[in-house]
Structures are given as structure tokens and as C-alpha cells.
């Protein structure tokens, strides 16, 4: 299987001397749904920033679909769509216009840009909000707007940095469904998250990053097989007639 992303010995040291990345090696196959899991400060966002050309690497190589970051940054950037963690669009611009404007940055003709904006806003449940300023959208709607904007130039690789942060459970699951359908159409997806449950639901392979280093890179199946089952002993005042449901862990009470 061909490679969508290949990273070799990637490092990043900031001006204050803080080393955010310490020689990362990472491969993501074309068509994969890949999770990059780690705590705050682990290096996830720095890695995404380098891939999206917003952060300059210190050393190492990055190759996306055959495009080298140093030799062909424009072609590399065109092949990816990035959904950042923070909202970074004009809060006074209309929802529809935000997506169309993004398409223009990639030289997409206006007619095609408008058709794609309608397509993705409809798929993400935002078409009825097309004429309202983005500032009036809820947090979940803004997340979906950023996904539509990232997809409008039809990238081969979609990178999402904590896309469901602050999103309620119902909306989170609808976004999971949409992303799964995208991946089934052949788009390679890299997802950064804090949540193992999210990675388990969506991803086939996973890399775990901590203190700027990849500490695990394996299939989701292998990782879950390595996890130990923890047993909790509860001393209850009264007997229970039925076992309680553990929210977030359906059918896992043993």
C-alpha cells in the first residue's frame, strides 16, 4: 500500500529552547484512518502545524503523497486539508462565503466553489445557516464549518486537530459518521485526540505521542489487546438488584 504521509527524524525546537518534537518517525498509509493520541503538550499540535506549513520544523523530512515539504511546499499544502483546534475564520463573514473564499485560495473557479460549498454545508447540516454570520453559530456548528472549509479544495489527506473538543455527545457521533463516510470514499484521515474511545471508534491505526516522541505506533486492534482490564471493588451500603450502566462504556461491566 502506498504512503500518504512519511515523516523521518522530525524535530522542532522553539526560540525559548523548548524542544517540542524529538526525532519523530511516522508513516500513514494511503486510505488509512489514523489517530495521533497524546496528552496536552505532547507535540500533537506542533506536528500538525508543521504538516500544514504553519510551523517551521527544525530538522527532519516530511513527505505527503510524494511532495517533499522543503522542495514542493505548495503542492504538499494543496494535497491536505486542515481542521485546526481553534476557530480561525472571520466571525462577521457569512458561512457560505467562508467556504467559497477558501476555495478561491486554491484557484477553484467561482461556479465550482459555490457548488462545493453547497455540497459540504448540506452534508454537514449547515445549509440553512449559509447566509448567517459565523459568529452566530454554535461551537459545534463552527467545528463543522471548519471541516467544510478544509474539504472544499478536495484534498487527499484530511487532518483534524481535536475536532470534537467541547462538542456534545450527539453531535460528536454525527461527526464520527460523516468522517467515516469520507474515509470510505478514499480520503486519508489523521485525527488528533485525547480520547481513546474516539480513536477506537474511528481509527484503524494509532500513534501515541508523549513529550515530543512517538512511544507507540501500532494497529488499534493490537493496542486494545495490550490494555489491561482494571478491577474496582465497591463497598455499597445497599444491595443492587440490577447492575448500573457505566456511561461511556456500554456493555463493558463484568
Predicted regions and their residues:
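A short, flexible loop at the N-terminus of ABC-type nucleotide-binding domains that lies
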Residues: 1-7, 11-23, 73
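Conserved ABC transporter NBD signature motif
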Residues: 60-68, 75-76
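ABC transporter nucleotide-binding domain
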Residues: 176-254
Amino acid at each position: 500500500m502506498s504512503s500518504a504521509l512519511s515523516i523521518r527524524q522530525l524535530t522542532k525546537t522553539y526560540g525559548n529552547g523548548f524542544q517540542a518534537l524529538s526525532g519523530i518517525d511516522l508513516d500513514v498509509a494511503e486510505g488509512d484512518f489514523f489517530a495521533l493520541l497524546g496528552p496536552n503538550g505532547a507535540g500533537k499540535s506542533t506536528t500538525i502545524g508543521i504538516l500544514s506549513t504553519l510551523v517551521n520544523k527544525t530538522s527532519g523530512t516530511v513527505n505527503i503523497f510524494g511532495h517533499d515539504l522543503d522542495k514542493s511546499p505548495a503542492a504538499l499544502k494543496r494535497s491536505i486539508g486542515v481542521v485546526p483546534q481553534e476557530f480561525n475564520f472571520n466571525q462577521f463573514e457569512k458561512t457560505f462565503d467562508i467556504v467559497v473564499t477558501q476555495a478561491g485560495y486554491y484557484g477553484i473557479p467561482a461556479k465550482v466553489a459555490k457548488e462545493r460549498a453547497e455540497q459540504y454545508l448540506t452534508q454537514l447540516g449547515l445549509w440553512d445557516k449559509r447566509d448567517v454570520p459565523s459568529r452566530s453559530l454554535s461551537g459545534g456548528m463552527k467545528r463543522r464549518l471548519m471541516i467544510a472549509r478544509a474539504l472544499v479544495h478536495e484534498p487527499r489527506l484530511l487532518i483534524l486537530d481535536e475536532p470534537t473538543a467541547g462538542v456534545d455527545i450527539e453531535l460528536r457521533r454525527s461527526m464520527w459518521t460523516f468522517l467515516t463516510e469520507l474515509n470510505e470514499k478514499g480520503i486519508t484521515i489523521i485525527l488528533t485526540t485525547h480520547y481513546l474511545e474516539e480513536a477506537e471508534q474511528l481509527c484503524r491505526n494509532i500513534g501515541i505521542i508523549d513529550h515530543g516522541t512517538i512511544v507507540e505506533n501500532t494497529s488499534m486492534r493490537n493496542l486494545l489487546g495490550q490494555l489491561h482490564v482494571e478491577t474496582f471493588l465497591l463497598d455499597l451500603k445497599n444491595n443492587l438488584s440490577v447492575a448500573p450502566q457505566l456511561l461511556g462504556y456500554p456493555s463493558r461491566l463484568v
